[in-house]
Amino acid sequence: MKKMIFAAILATVSAVSMAEGTNGHFTGFGVGAELGATDWSDGGRTVADVNAVGSYGFAFPGTELVGQADVKYNFGNGRVYSDNGVSIKARNTFSVGYAQGYRVTPNIMPYAKVSYVSTDLKASSGGLFGSSRVHGVGVGVGAKMAVDSNVELGAEYQHARLSNSDFDGHLKTNSLNVGAAIRF
């Protein structure tokens, strides 16, 4: 997993060094917010998402390709599992991702994305408590639309598989989010 994260960071750094400065929509620094839902398939629960997003987009010279690196933090504290007195909540969820997009028009950009996702699961049963951080890789697709020179709207779907060394198996999540961002 550490090798995958290192490779993703190295690829992003090399892509940024090859990219030209900000030109057109979807480039430059951006901050925004997302609302959506995440379905935890192993727990059978759907949890509401409220995400803060920071990103940096850059254009590739002579093409309509746009790369975007982003960081997301989920403010939710949702219950992802509840059965027979056992309750598990997901909290402190964050992701670091890279999206490769293509401007099909000057104002519309579909993209594919890969992310590192990490969340803290807190379990309680009666008077017993425990927590474990799970992490993994998410893949997704989305689209953004520039409604003004500095404002963009977007929608994104992501599937992630999360695990850790103490957990046998994978937790699977499916997220659908819509959001707005301001670019600088």
Where are these regions (language model features)?
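Gram-negative bacterial Sec-dependent N-terminal signal peptides
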Residues: 1-19
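Gram-negative outer-membrane beta-barrel domains
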Residues: 17-184
